[in-house]
Amino acid sequence: MKTGIAVTVTLACLIGCTLLLFAGWELIIIGALCVLFAFLYTTGPYPLSYNGWGDVLVIIFFGFVPVGGTYYVQALTWTPDVTIASFICGLLIDTLLVVNNYRDREADARSGKRTVIVRFGEKFGRYFYLLLGISASLLCLYFLREGHIYAALLPQLYLVPHVLTWRRMVKIHSGKKLNSILGETSRNMLFMGILL
């Protein structure tokens, strides 16, 4: 596994270095932080994913870094729209982590992994999933302020499959059957990406 991580990180660094042709040296800092937190996520004396930081890291490194970073490399600036779009994407991707942690909550508790669901309980996990999707949709309404009517209103359609998936998750409650919720959540994320 360590070899796979090393190969992946090396390839990511090589690809990331090509972005330096389009943007400045500050990308080196962002890239170094990405590599550092990739290792700190599950290794070291204080593995972040084992101590309830997984959700925060997902929002940062799957929301702000890729969405904002991509925009920055192309435009060499950062706008409030980019901040909101980055946060929306981070929240959506975190729904996938929440389903995973919800499914694994009992095993995580036994192994000492203190995810937010282990810390705050199964009921919290259910509503956390629902809240992430609703928050992402409602944040899209910000785009009305900028005159982007479709970017504000179309994503509200995401709420339908999100709530339906949440209801199924609550009914299934535990076990391997929750794997189907991972698939539905991924589908819902793709749907939101198309709508946005």
Q: What are the residue ranges of the model-derived segments?
A:
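Acidic (Asp/Glu-rich) catalytic motifs at the cytosolic membrane interface
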Residues: 95-117
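Alpha-helical membrane-inserting segments
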Residues: 18-19, 66-73, 96, 139, ...
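Intramembrane alpha-helical segments
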Residues: 1-80
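Structural signature of hydrophobic alpha-helical transmembrane segments
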Residues: 23-34, 86-88, 151-156
